[in-house]
Amino acid sequence: MLNGLRTQPWLYRKFRSAPNLAMTEEQFRGEAVELASVLMTNQYSASNAEIFSEGYRRMKIGPIVGEATGGNVLTVSGFISLWDGGGIQIPFIGVVTPEGEYLEGKGRRVDVDVRFDPNAWNEGRDNQLEAAVRELMKRIK
């Protein structure tokens, strides 16, 4: 979805086996509908959700509300079973910004930090969603 909004590379993937090879996210150079939007994230937003969050922020599409993402962005190989029932996966592709910063281990920050409130949730309210709606309403003309 982000690729329809941007014509310059905003993220690269680097292979462990070929450190000098960098692959950009696919780029679509069509037209995009520009509407007000807000992105919600939390510490459970991982993998492509973190990539989407990074692109959303870099492209200045709108504010990001909630909590920083977890920082889990590596591409891994197949699952290798262990004798005790566990297993391992080997990371082989890292996701890198144009400035060379790896996303792995560094949660994507938010513009409006709103911690989940379990008491509000028990009352039938979602304080993070409420904050996101407030931010969106500021942008609707």
PLM features: what roles do these ranges have?
Residues 37, 45-60:
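Cysteine-centered nucleophilic/redox motifs
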Residues 1-7, 13-16, 48-54, 67-68, ...:
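Intrinsically disordered, Ser/Thr/Pro/Gly-rich linkers and terminal tails that flank
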Residues 25-26, 58, 72, 138-141:
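Bimodal feature
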Residues 59-73:
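Short, well-structured beta-strand/strand-turn elements
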Residues 1-40, 44, 73-82, 92-96, ...:
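Gly/Ser/Thr-rich loop/hinge elements
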Residues 33-36, 60-63, 139:
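Loop/turn elements at helix/coil->beta-strand transitions in domains of secreted/extracellular proteins
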